[in-house]
Amino acid sequence: MRATEFLIERWTKKTLDNYFDHKQDLDFKNSDVQVSEPFDGCILLKYKTVPDVARSFFRVTEYYDGKHYGGSDRSVSLVDFLDNWMDRAGNVDYFKFWDGFNIPDHAFRAWKRSAGGLTSAEQVMVDAVNRASKGLKKYCVIGVGGTDSATLRHEMFHARYYLDSTFKSQADALIQAHKNDPAFKAITQTLIKKLDYVNHVDEEAAAYLYTGSQMKLVFGTQAKHLVKLFQELDQK
């Protein structure tokens, strides 16, 4: 494609308006995030949009759980992140796709030590967590963007799994009892091969089953019998 054709295709009224609007308000403010504690130790940060929560959490999440960084002490640089996530067309769909995040306290503290300079979005997130975690011996940070109730339920599973030993034991018992179920295997394989999970795969599968949303679309299986079992954790 010649340069002039590229500009004609890319420079439309909509793309220009979006680009110019984006330049008007780049800085995050404390008012851009709502902070609450749904239950003891669970620090919930709610953002208006998916890009807002993803901008705030992408480095700490990749440090804790990412394919290229999870399980290591390496800091997550923006250059490496873009190299790993940008496709050949220049798209980084991470910031429009991932709408929920969960970070246990030990990972959050370790990431802060390695992170170096913070973006404005990260600084607002860190300040919010520092205030909310004051006096807490153990906590889990969850961040959600938008208003999807399934995303919130999914992240709440992770927080309960980390903070509530009884809940974790019951969830682990279900995982062990059904790890060889074809539906459970299908979920874990999709997580590993298509969604780039390396660590905490069984926990992640359990969180999706506990949520029970869009199972067929994402994993190719309804897994209704497993969804029922994991959702019954609320009744125990």
Residue ranges and their predicted role:
Residues 1-29, 160-163, 170-172, 189, ...:
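Charge-dense, intrinsically disordered terminal/linker segments
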Residues 6-139:
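A metal-dependent hydrolase signature that marks the N-terminal structural subdomain at the beginning
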Residues 49, 165-166, 179-180:
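Residues that cap or delimit alpha-helices
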Residues 139-152:
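Short pre-active-site segment immediately N-terminal to the catalytic Zn-binding motif
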Residues 150-163:
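Active-site recognition of the HExxH zinc-binding catalytic motif
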